[in-house]
Amino acid sequence: MAKNYYDITLALAGICQSARLVQQLAHEGQCDNDALNTVLRGLLQTNPSSTLAVYGDTEQVLKMGLETLQSVLNANRQGEAAELTRYTLSLMVLERKLSASKSAMNTLGERISQLDRQLAHFDLESETMMSSLASIYVDVVSPLGPRIQVTGSPAILQSPLVQAKVRATLLAGIRSAVLWQQVGGSRLQLMFSRNRLFKQAQSILAHT
């Protein structure tokens, strides 16, 4: 069956957008709020009509992720680009561990469905919601291992709010990685279909 590289690239961009946001948070203590909102909202889409619907039905909101994906595919193994590649691959590894555990997947689904009650009272980007999302990551994903080593400014990373945002963003990255697998993504494509993925990202970016 032919792979749908459009859907695969969108889901990859979702993973990469989370990776870039984690990097921004770890180094600067803040991040692009619109890009963050996009990946966090994706967590709440449990029955989307399409891959794009997970992110809000517009390619524009994945611009950061598509640009980051191109950077990862360019295989720059230095500095910040190497960090992005490490985060992206680590999220993919964790997703495989999560998907292999039926009980963890069930718990994750239950915990995410419970967020609706809180969202009736709090904004998605509020400290309360960040804390709730972070606790889901700590309780459900972290025990599966291996831990994702987040590097940045030690002073910034000591902030409880930054820690919560980083974990919430990693959880959103896992959601995109689950989607990526569902639409036919695999790590082999990052080696053998690099050109095709790069061109697909370029093509989508041309419309944004």
From Swiss-Prot:
This protein's record includes keyword Phosphoprotein: no
Pfam families reported in the protein's UniProt record: DUF489
Cell location: Cytoplasm; Cell inner membrane
Membrane topology designation: Peripheral membrane protein
UniProt GO cellular component terms: cytoplasm; plasma membrane
Cysteine disulfide partners in this protein: none
Top-level taxonomic group: Bacteria
UniProt KW keywords: Cell inner membrane, Cell membrane, Cytoplasm, Membrane
Family: Belongs to the HflD family.
NCBIfam families: PRK00218.1-2, PRK00218.1-4, PRK00218.1-5
Name used for this protein in its record: High frequency lysogenization protein HflD homolog
Protein species of origin: Yersinia pestis
Gene that produces this protein: hflD
